[in-house]
Amino acid sequence: MQCPTCQNTDSRVLESRSADTGKSVRRRRECLNCSFRFTTYERVETMPISVIKKDGSRELFNKDKLVTGISRACEKTTFSRESIINFVDSIESQIVQDSNKDIKSSQIGELILKGLRKENEVAYIRYASVYRKFNGVKDFVSTLESLKGSSKNELASIL
């Protein structure tokens, strides 16, 4: 590993430990040339995943897009930023396990909806309204009915 101060490539590892909930290894190193101590992180390199969009075009999987979309759905809820990151990490893990390098955007959307339904009902409704392109109150009502199993009459009296 190259020293950040003298650029020497000889270093020794002083300490190693698991980091990022087991997804990486944190190593404390010391340069054999200048004795500067620095930290490195090692993680498994994953194969790039291609997302097949609705129009048939492809783009590389971008975790940041998921974080942004889910963050919008979770605004003003009890879902913390850390919870969002952990949620997106779990979605990414499912995608990596389930796909061979290609996944449809609709499959990603359904994974997110399935997870949000368990985690936070408000975020689920918000995400579903954008993902499924709700056109009016009826779309919200039918989603609320499926979420709670309520009858139309009960919801109509509330609205």
Curated annotation (Swiss-Prot):
GO terms for biological process: negative regulation of DNA-templated transcription. The keyword Zinc-finger applies. Negatively regulates transcription of bacterial ribonucleotide reductase nrd genes and operons by binding to NrdR-boxes. Binds 1 zinc ion. Keywords: ATP-binding, DNA-binding, Metal-binding, Nucleotide-binding, Repressor, Transcription, Transcription regulation, Zinc, Zinc-finger. Pfam families: ATP-cone (PF03477), Zn_ribbon_NrdR (PF22811). A zinc finger (unnamed) spans 3-34. This is Transcriptional repressor NrdR. InterPro entries: ATP-cone_dom, NrdR-like_N, RNR_NrdR-like. Transmembrane segments: none annotated. The keyword Zinc-finger applies. Residues 49-139 form the ATP-cone domain. Belongs to the NrdR family. GO terms for molecular function: ATP binding; DNA binding; zinc ion binding.
